[in-house]
Amino acid sequence: MPKRSDIQSVLVIGSGPIVIGQAAEFDYSGTQACRVLKAEGLRVILVNSNPATIMTDPEIADATYVEPITPEFVEKIIAKERPDALLPTLGGQTALNTAISMHDNGVLEKYGVELIGANVEAINKGEDRDLFKGVVEAVKEKIGYGESARSVICHSMDDVIAGVDTLGGYPVVVRPSFTMGGAGSGFAHDEEELRRIAGQGLTLSPTTEVLLEESILGWKEYELELMRDRNDNVVVVCSIENFDPMGVHTGDSITVAPAMTLTDREYQRLRDVGIAIIREVGVDTGGCNIQFAIDPTDGRVIVIEMNPRVSRSSALASKATGFPIAKIAAKLAVGYTLDEIPNDITEKTPASFEPTLDYVVVKAPRFAFEKFPSADSSLTTTMKSVGEAMAIGRNFTEALQKALRSLEKKGSQFAFTGPVGDKAELLAEAVRPTDGRINTVMQAIRAGATQEEVFDATKIDPWFVDQLFLIKEIADELASAERLDAGLIAEAKRHGFSDAQIGGIRGLREDVVREVRHALGIRPVYKTVDTCAAEFAAKTPYFYSSYDEESEVAPRTKPAVIILGSGPNRIGQGIEFDYSCVHASFALSDAGYETVMVNCNPETVSTDYDTSDRLYFEPLTLEDVLEIVHAESLAGPIAGVIVQLGGQTPLGLSQALKDNGVPVVGTSPEAIHAAEDRGAFGRVLAEAGLPAPKHGTATTFAEAKAIADEIGYPVLVRPSYVLGGRGMEIVYDETRLASYISESTEISPTRPVLVDRFLDDAIEIDVDALYDGTELYLGGVMEHIEEAGIHSGDSACALPPITLGGFDIKRLRASTEGIAKGVGVLGLINIQFALSGDILYVLEANPRASRTVPFTSKATAVPLAKAAARISLGATIAELRAEGLLPRTGDGGTLPLDAPISVKEAVMPWSRFRDIHGRGVDTVLGPEMRSTGEVMGIDSVFGTAYAKSQAGAYGPLPTAGRAFISVANRDKRSMIFPARELVAHGFELMATSGTAEVLKRNGINATVVRKQSEGTGPNGEKTIVQHIHDGEVDLIVNTPYGTGGRLDGYEIRTAAVARSVPCLTTVQALAAAVQGIDALNHGGVGVRSLQEHAEHLTAARD
């Protein structure tokens, strides 16, 4: 059945900001789908609030709305654009929930919009836990196996407590309906835990419903990815097995494709159940993902859940098999059937052929517990990882070791040196699933644990345990051999050992091992991911390395540019860097180069097989990159390697690559050092005559104390060379300085600690610019809403700046040019300034693409990353202006007066983390970056743009109700006017005694509320935290002070997170919110597409 002719335009809903559980994989699937639909001649309308995505680029859809993904805003877009259909299955849970609520409240019917890709009945059957139970029972009646875990549905805490007895006692699993990434779920071992987990679950579920289930801890966990069309063709795209048993969320588990430990009969059984379920649920134009548990003792199969949409696993399955699930789902949604869709990779086979794999894929999660030191690091059914790396090998051991190496984290690879630990202690530690459990298991094996002991402690399948023993045996052979011969090195390489690991075991430097290996002629070959185990020829070069026989890299004539990606997402280095890499690939391809992408992150657009001419799915380590450069140099000429776009990961390789004779283009490694190294950068500033805050470098506590005494407190303390502000802190007195140095840093002459004067009350400014060696193009000037001292990645900012004048911009332009010239930048540079009093201080400069590049590009309608890639390879700004890649005149510092105002807001993952006592993690922002993603609000005035950014990040600002205010003494004066505005808008104020007193003296009424530390009053008056928990507060303003009032504030802020009440922690944010509330109350908040904004800007420029 060919494409439907009754659909001319489609609205696609994206997934919004990157949060834990819903990350870059939805940008990847959404981008693919928009392209396919556009190629089919449909008008594509997209809504997504996340500016760091490729899908929100103006060329991907016909009309792109960077607006909050809420039913109210989506309705405005539908009213304006009048699409025929709505496709909600590509934007994760956010899109699905929004679509369902718009179906339920009649908006879709009112405007005659049809849901495609999944019908409401199918979505409900898949997502509603009770209905899904019915589906599984119906399947069991038909085919005789597959069942659900025993469970009860609860709508109140009383139901929950009673439910435990029905199931036969603890432990029980709590799962809320319609949430994602396991939000609000967990294992409860006693009543206290149950009350806490179920309480949060009832709050998070949009239907206030949780399911209690019997515990299946320790069972084996599997997933199947399936697709079905309306002719009832079903394909099983991929089977995935979790290395960790049940009890760890699949997003936090190491996973393997294809499944390794299923017998053929068990696999056929899972297939039968899966196919029966997709039919019973009624998914008939798209894909779904089904999770199973198998009891290792008797083979009982339990169906855990299904997602009737494109999911995190489908991105992994697409990258693992080369079968583009999202692309095919989009085609099915507009009426095609599987047998009509050709396979892009072979061009011979249709999509109804199931992919076959002649390799093994391993995904390993990347965590960020170091950012939340108080959080409980146990892995549970709530997802906590922030990113993932994927590796491909010819066998499991090779893929596993490559995946662990790809995580780029200290201690992520297996270590076979160092003292052997105590077996009993290590086994006891391995019982609790944590981030590095696989390494603990390896240490236990080193300490003499047997396979049975490891299985009893961890319940990890004996086959996997056996593979770990095999890796350990190879390490022992390496250690005991008299000399390193060719056979031994080749064997170690086939099991995934890196040169560094071999060197560690033999007591040699990594480069020495590499020399020996090359002298013996042992190098990897590159194999193709072809979907068909080499039965048909593959047309797309998508490679992985292996120590095998023949290489499949074809010769080429065009000069190649190798772009190094950013590896697994983490806090501080996310999708924004991937965005710049993808843009570089597009721009250089247009300019006649062959583009080669190197990356190992399965969630991203950069690792899509049609983003670049060639893709290497490999770890970003020096060894792996050098081998790729070698393989490509045999294939044809290399124009250079780009390291400045992928964040800190490739930047850290630049000097070593250059030392190995690799041509690094753009900013030179020496220039990178001049900006990153404190001393060298200080000299650049001195030559340009620019002030920086007073600072010093200390290698002992005595030195640090002396510097702090001279500069004066508060001071900012941090280790040198860091991304995302790791380990920074604002220190107010000497005792805290002493504890910071003893607790948190390895301090030594080679690893000094930097002590800076902390600029209180300064305005922080971010600048993105391009420099070609002679001319500067100012990309954009962003003014931060929060004051200096909050990491720029966590602060909201506005572009164009809202309070800076023409004179300030002139100074910023001159300073930026001075620094770019002094450092020697070719391409992008990002500089952070602080304006304190009348002095413009330089805080830091990064000679690379920054995380604000996508935001700046969208806000000013100029593709900065594309321009940067061209400049790295020799183009000048003047040439790019003539070509039309940059505006003919003016730049981001001279935007027209009526340019729209864009506000970027950071999104935090607070609700995911709890400490071991189950308390939340404090939400106060500081100099260490903790956000996982961002949203953008764009409108003609600041108030509305800010209100949109808040709605996109945390849910809409309240326009009336009760506001609670409690601020530090230093903020009391500046809080009076915004507080008076809130009253004018009809808010009722509540405040703690100190704040209420100041308000009253200024003629503002506020009800006094008890602090948490004062406890409940004699007549049962509630404390503020009780008011929040009881849902009696709509807005919270709470600024932290010192360390005394810290605890009260902490209780208030964590309660706000648990109940999802907007909580502002700075007076600046309150002032912005008041402008936003004002804009909302005066109604008429409209929506405009990026294309309309861009037309307006371009017209004003000419």
Curated annotation (Swiss-Prot):
The protein's superkingdom reads: Bacteria
So what EC number does this one have?
Answer: 6.3.4.16, 6.3.5.5
Describe the location of the ATP-grasp domain by residue ranges. 137-334, 682-873
Q: Where along this sequence does the record place binding of Mg(2+) 3?
A: 832, 844
Q: Where does Mn(2+) 2 bind?
A: 305, 307
Which segments carry the region annotation Oligomerization domain? 409-551
Location of the MGS-like domain: 955-1100
Q: What's a single GO CC term here?
A: cytoplasm
Output the InterPro entries linked to this UniProt entry.
ATP-grasp, ATP_grasp_subdomain_1, CarbamoylP_synth_lsu, CarbamoylP_synth_lsu_oligo, CarbamoylP_synth_lsu_oligo_sf, CbamoylP_synth_lsu-like_ATP-bd, CbamoylP_synth_lsu_CPSase_dom, MGS-like_dom
UniProt GO molecular function: ATP binding; carbamoyl-phosphate synthase (ammonia) activity; carbamoyl-phosphate synthase (glutamine-hydrolyzing) activity; metal ion binding
Q: Which cofactor does it need?
A: Mg(2+); Mn(2+)
**Could you tell me which residues belong to the region Allosteric domain?**
955-1102
UniProt entry keywords in alphabetical sequence: Amino-acid biosynthesis, Arginine biosynthesis, ATP-binding, Ligase, Magnesium, Manganese, Metal-binding, Nucleotide-binding, Pyrimidine biosynthesis, Repeat
SMART domains for this protein: CPSase_L_D3, MGS
Q: Which Gene3D superfamilies match?
A: 3.40.50.20, ATP-grasp fold, A domain, ATP-grasp fold, B domain, Carbamoyl-phosphate synthetase, large subunit oligomerisation domain, Methylglyoxal synthase-like domain
Annotated residues that bind Mn(2+) 3 are located at: 832, 844
Catalytic reaction list: hydrogencarbonate + L-glutamine + 2 ATP + H2O = carbamoyl phosphate + L-glutamate + 2 ADP + phosphate + 2 H(+)
GO biological process, alphabetically ordered: 'de novo' UMP biosynthetic process; glutamine metabolic process; L-arginine biosynthetic process
Similarity section: Belongs to the CarB family.
Q: What is known of its domains?
A: The large subunit is composed of 2 ATP-grasp domains that are involved in binding the 2 ATP molecules needed for carbamoyl phosphate synthesis. The N-terminal ATP-grasp domain (referred to as the carboxyphosphate synthetic component) catalyzes the ATP-dependent phosphorylation of hydrogencarbonate to carboxyphosphate and the subsequent nucleophilic attack by ammonia to form a carbamate intermediate.
The name this protein goes by in its record: Carbamoyl phosphate synthase large chain
